[in-house]
Amino acid sequence: MEAKHLTMGCCYLSRRLNQLSSHDPLWKRHCKKYWLISDEEKIRRNQSWKAIFVSTYSDLGRYIQYYATLKKAWDDLEKYLGQRCPRMIGSLKESVQEEDLDAVEAQIGCKLPDDYRCSFRIHNGQKLVVPGLMGSMALSNHYRSEDLLDIDTAAGGFQQRLGLKQCLPLTFCIHTGLSQYMALESVEGRNKYEIFYQCPDQMARNPSAIDMFITGTSYLEWFTSYVNKVVTGGYPIIRDQIFRYVHDKECVATTGDITVSVSTSFLPELSSVHPPHYFFTYRIRIEMSKDALPEKACQLDSRYWRITNAKGDVEEVQGPGVVGEFPIISPGRVYEYTSCTTFSTTSGYMEGYYTFHCLYYKEKFFNVTIPRFHMVCPTFKVSTARMETNHNEYAVDEDEDSTDTDEYEDRRRVMDIPAPSGRCPHHT
């Protein structure tokens, strides 16, 4: 009798579980949580929530822990670009299928991480065009714009040579040849799935001695952190491009009616670890309040810099104007310019002031504070080839900090900018 009751109870429980599992509203939450399916999309697909979840899971189930995060990042990025850089949207490629990703794994002989695969199930990178999705940087004689590579182009650039063994390029700049790579195996001192800019050891005679500036610990972290900076306004949009200048909100100084703010960027393609030569560019914005009186209009005459490296060494620099110009600032007007500097230490900071004269009272001069702004190079790893090689095999080459940023920039106009595998230009 007890066995009969137990059997009947199990049957009832099974029927109840079956009824619950078919209750469509229960599947709605999972569809929205894991696949970001909207009510509008459900109507368009004309399927039940359960059917949508099951069909999507059968296709993308292996990515369930990544899909919602990456899909939201892509959706946010597309929405933002549609408003701020619409022409960039046209360079994005449609998604690839599982068999395409499997074929690439077979071609390169390495497994791709699931977060990377998941992203390419949403968008297959972009066309090799300018501007690049992964950000730009420009100086008077130097331009970088990184495209997010599609899966086939990335596979074609897969590296097996010493120094970059089993590394897959994620980005590429057609102007500089610069790429960010992802390590598909833990070899040559790299962690698996670590992302980095290559930086040849210029003091080594061994071409496999390649140092690395680290930009991410996984594809998910690398891509979503970049997108977050873009869509929250962390990177400025200049001439319909994403420029990778970082602005510290504390780095603002107001003197009277004039406000000065600074954003900075590290340029890995013009930097090296050996010898220590770290190249930074900075963008300065000078603005006069729109509420200032007309007679407050003034002209910039000169600049003064106090430059301090990580060792505490201080250098003072003075010069006329900025980047060869003597801008006039009037109520509501903004003036922006870009310049650069180098350090032989991994970090440093600059501060100073501009000297202006009033246009209405030509004998009246005053100083405007430039806030202190810090420049720090990314975390880097030294090539294992260096650690394994006799120090006698390394050349001796000393580098110095730049002495005057504007003059340094002028001198660089007559230099050829090398590809990442070349030798970084030095200040002389």
Range-by-range predicted roles:
Residues 266-279, 292-296, 327-331, 343-345:
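Short, solvent-exposed beta-strand/turn "edge" segments of beta-rich domains on protein surfaces
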Residues 292-314:
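Short acidic, flexible loop segments centered on an aromatic residue
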Residues 341-386:
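Terminal connector regions
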Residues 312-347:
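Intrinsically disordered, low-complexity Pro/Gly/Ser/Thr-rich segments with frequent PxxP/GP/PP motifs
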Residues 3, 10-13, 19-178:
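A surface-exposed partner-binding patch
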Residues 368-428:
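Acidic, serine/threonine- and proline-rich intrinsically disordered appendage/tail regions
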Residues 239-281:
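Low-complexity, acidic Ser/Thr/Pro/Gly-rich terminal tails and inter-domain linkers that flank the onset
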Residues 280-288:
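Short, well-ordered beta-strand segments enriched in hydrophobic/aromatic residues
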